[in-house]
Each structure stands twice: as C-alpha cells, then as structure tokens.
Amino acid sequence: MLGDPPRLTIIAGANGCGKSTFTARSSFVYRIPLLDPDAISKALQPTAPGRSAVAAARKVLNSACQHIEKGEGFAVETTLSGKGYLQMTLDARARGFEVVQVYIGTERVEINLGRIRDRVIAGGHDVPEVDVRRRYLRSFQNLAAGSVAPTT
C-alpha cells in the first residue's frame, strides 16, 4: 500500500531446517527480491557451490546494503550463525524499514542433518556436519540476541 514502510523479511534457521522449502512455497517472496546465499553460491560455482559460500555471503550482504540504502523491500535467507544480520536489522530499522523475522527451527540437529543428507541425494548441496552442529547452536543464540535488539 502507498505510504507503507519498506519491509526487510529475514528468513532464518540453521542449515537444513527448511528455509528454501519455505521460500519456495511462500507467495510473498515472488513480490520482492530474495537474497539467497545458497542460490548465489550455486550460480557462482555450479559444480561445487560450497567453495563459493564466502563470496556468496559477501554478495548477499552487499546487495542487502544497496536495498536498504534505496529504501527497497527485500527478503534474505540466513542461518543467523554470524552477527552481520543483527547489524543489518538495526540499519534497516534506522532507515524506516519494518523488519519481519521468520525463524524455522527443528527440535534437534539430527533432523537438520537428515534433511541435508536427503538434499544431497536429490542433487543439492552438502554442508559439513561439524558446521551444521556449530551453526545450529549459534543460530538459536543469535536469534535470542536479535529478539532483544532495540526497535527504535
């Protein structure tokens, strides 16, 4: 609607929780740009997307900054395993964005590991188990930190 603030939608959760499944089935994503590090990584290096993960993450953060500077709404997928998205949220709010966070979680990391195994069998990308386990805990910790971030 006219006059509504731009919206930053953060779709968060640990590796293998179902972020991409959620966005693929969510009609709101078709109306705004979606910054998906996994899709960018695959585009950068189709045969070994894991090798371009850092470059993809950098590209997502740069694109997010551009959208925020222009006042354009967008969505972004993240594991929330780093602190960069907390700062992005603060920057977006400071520029008048409405920030919506959708967190997708599972009861235990083994569910995520099983989903990743299934994804690999289906031709998708793998994530090392040690990374999944580390990010699983960090994701929940950063979710809690982001939940108490100032809203003004």
Give, region by region, the residue ranges found by the protein language model.
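Glycine-rich phosphate-binding loop used to anchor ATP phosphates in small-molecule kinases
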Residues: 52-104, 136-139
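The Walker A (P-loop) glycine that initiates the GxxxxGKT/S ATP-binding motif of P-loop NTPases
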Residues: 10-13, 78
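Phosphate-binding P-loop
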Residues: 1-6, 67-68
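The conserved Walker
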Residues: 14-15, 20
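A glycine- and Lys/Arg-enriched "phosphate-lid" helix/loop adjacent to the NTP-binding pocket
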Residues: 97-142
